[in-house]
């Protein structure tokens, strides 16, 4: 039986007077992903931010490896928001190096160059991010996924602005992450062609 990593029980969140969701319960085991689906405004991003500890719930509990979230959880978390978290004045390589450094991941330059090659940014690695297209900026985050050893990924619409080749690479990267015992929580409008025993669905606002 796979290790139970994340446990969510009785989670509820409001936006002002409006109830986004309530009584949300789920678990995520090692080697599995949970995809959160729902219409715009149903609370998908709020749910992800609440699990990460970025938004306070109105009710409920989130536990990591059987305990309350703390430094250990933050050290094992990779959060990718809806917008690419890049600094315009830094180059693609500098943004990647900074993101990995903040996560405490020491990655040799040759491995960073290999990841930038995989995502099609090696020849643009020295360009300031402000000169990159939206899709190229998203590829910096994809390079981080290739390199970051964090076991738990929380990704908000990770396929947005990626072309077909980059989407395929992201799915291969996610599949490899799950195969080595990682886990993921994703909000996405896309169907993810992963093995049925690795991915489950949670629909909000149904």
Name these PLM-found stretches:
Residues 97, 109-124:
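Conserved ABC ATPase "signature" region
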Residues 89, 128-135:
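Conserved ABC ATPase signature
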Residues 57-75:
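Conserved ABC transporter NBD signature motif
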Residues 153-157:
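Catalytic Walker B motif of ABC-type/P-loop ATPase nucleotide-binding domains
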Residues 52:
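Helix-to-loop junction immediately C-terminal to a conserved catalytic motif
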Residues 83, 88-104, 111:
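Q-loop/switch helix immediately C-terminal to the Walker
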Residues 142, 181:
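Hydrophobic anchor residue at the start of the ABC signature
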């Amino acid at each position: 039986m796979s290790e139970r990593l994340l446990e969510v029980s009785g989670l509820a969140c409001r936006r002002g007077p409006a109830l986004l969701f309530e009584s949300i319960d789920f678990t995520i085991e090692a080697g599995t992903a949970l995809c959160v689906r729902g219409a715009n405004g149903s609370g998908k991003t709020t749910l992800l931010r609440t699990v990460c500890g970025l938004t306070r719930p109105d009710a409920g509990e989130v536990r990591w490896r059987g305990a309350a979230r703390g430094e250990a959880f933050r050290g094992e978390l990779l959060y990718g928001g809806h917008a690419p978290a890049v600094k315009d004045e830094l180059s693609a390589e500098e943004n990647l190096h900074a993101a990995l450094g903040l996560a405490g991941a020491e990655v040799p330059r040759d491995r960073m160059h290999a990841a930038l090659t995989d995502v099609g940014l090696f020849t643009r690695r020295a360009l300031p991010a402000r000169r990159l297209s939206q899709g190229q900026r998203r590829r910096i985050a994809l390079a981080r996924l290739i390199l970051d050893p964090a076991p738990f990924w929380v990704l908000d619409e990770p396929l947005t602005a990626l072309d077909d080749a980059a989407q395929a690479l992201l799915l291969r990267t996610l599949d490899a992450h799950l195969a080595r015992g990682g886990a993921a929580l994703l909000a996405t409008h896309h169907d993810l062609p992963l093995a049925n025993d690795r991915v489950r669905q949670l629909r909000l606002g149904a």
